[in-house]
Amino acid sequence: GAIHYLTKEEINNHTNYLENRLQTGKEYFSNRGYDHISVDQNGLHGSVIRNLTMPKQFTDWHYSFDIITNMGTTEHIEPIESQYECFSILHDCTKVGGIMIHLLPDVRLHDEHGAWKNHCPFYYSKSFFEILAKDCKYELLSNTIINGLRCVALRKIKDVTFMQDKSKFVLLIAQRNQEWSSGFVRNFLRRKGVGHFLRRLNLR
């Protein structure tokens, strides 16, 4: 099967596609030939309602997906200890040979330039993904910055258990205080994240 790679220019052109009211994430990926499944607790836009902090809810999807994208989702998963369960779900649901794509707020850009300030409680670093890739035996395909986001592509090349040291994992994630204007804004942003589970139609 084929993997379709996007150039930086193409990614920049589509960075805000989820904000476009004329096209949901499901429409975006389905129109490009993907059998698309999204997970969100609000159940909007055809998403499946599952809790990304509860691995038992995903056992039926283990080794099911060729591509999993995490674009604006995990940085809203609280408390910080639940980050471990969320990333373990992504690991377990990806096929061997499959790819995980992460577009998440970068902690260095947050601290030095205020990028994505007050957007979320958790931020990620280059070293976080380097250590994650080493421990989980991923091939690190890309680990760069695009439009203020840490953009990472990881290929799962071996059937190994997810990073076993939870304490080590949690310490790698940066937590920053938020100055939320209201509880409504905080809850809205937390619900907004959507984990996209993609499966090429011709790779079932």
Predicted regions span which residues?
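Conserved SAM-binding loop
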Residues: 1-2, 13-114
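S-adenosyl-L-methionine-dependent methyltransferase catalytic module, highlighting the catalytic core
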Residues: 78-204
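Intrinsically disordered, low-complexity, compositionally biased regions/tails
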Residues: 5, 29, 197-199
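Short, structured coil/loop segments at alpha-helix boundaries
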Residues: 11-13, 58, 191-195
